């Protein structure tokens, strides 16, 4: 299996941590994609993921799976004898999904919008609106306060153990701090 990724990008880092926690990282060939040079726009890459984003998992038969949590779900289901990071019981699975959605909608998306609209990094690919980016940044601050409240007296955000929720919140917080 091959994981097409960019070492510094947050979503591939989430997949790598997920794989490391499951003890599977050494079973994957990591293929670096230079998004700054536009390698993700090449016909070869677009054939793997028409959304032109990393990460992309390419299976032995050539099937490609894109999107961070879809890749994580593949490994969760394919390797049931490894630590469960997406929940074991129906309740745990529901709680993990709830938290993953909250982090996605109220933390990841606004952090990404803040970065894209305030740094100029994507100015050649989009029309950044600084005010929108700043407003998104304020929403990120509010959600970070919410996360801190939820963690008071606890080691983990969900299920009283380490899950994908902790991975996703960790990397997004690191990105939010950098933005």
Outline where the language-model segments fall:
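GST-like domain detector, emphasizing the conserved glutathione-binding G-site
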Residues: 1-134
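GST-like fold's C-terminal all-alpha helical module
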Residues: 103-179
